Amino acid sequence: MTMTDPLGDMLTRIRNGASRRKSSVSTPASKLRARVLDVLQAEGYIRGYSVVDFGNGKSELSIELKYYEGSSVIREIGRVSKPGRRVYVSVKSIPQVANGLGIIILSTPKGVMADHQAREQNVGGEVLCSVF
């Protein structure tokens, strides 16, 4: 069965794993998913991730979730731009999450980055997801 929203599937796996207090979750690998995980790791929302190669052309991302005092660092994570409704913003209209406590992850011409990096580089793009 084909997956219509691979990024949304990864975010759901992270959300479900965090709610069940799992130490790690796995998801099929792709370049976009890895770039989003790079941003999540740089911003301190996950411990890290590793690529597990099965040798038959398929690989998987093993994501290590992060907890602080028994509760997940990720309180909310959700998809903004969906396959049926893409959301694009200019640099001036990049939204804030929880008055700046959370982040927006954008796909820009300069790569996948957090909202504050996009403002610094003066670039807009597609709003992939929000994390708080």
Swiss-Prot record:
GO cellular component annotations of the record: ribonucleoprotein complex; ribosome
NCBIfam families, alphabetized: PRK00136.1
Example GO molecular function: rRNA binding
Pfam families: Ribosomal_S8
UniProtKB keywords: Ribonucleoprotein, Ribosomal protein, RNA-binding, rRNA-binding
Name of the protein in its database record: Small ribosomal subunit protein uS8
Disulfide bonds: none
Quaternary structure note: Part of the 30S ribosomal subunit. Contacts proteins S5 and S12.
GO BP terms, alphabetized: translation
General function of this protein: One of the primary rRNA binding proteins, it binds directly to 16S rRNA central domain where it helps coordinate assembly of the platform of the 30S subunit.
Family listed: Belongs to the universal ribosomal protein uS8 family.
Highest taxon listed in the record's lineage: Bacteria
Entry-linked Gene3D superfamilies: 3.30.1370.30, 3.30.1490.10
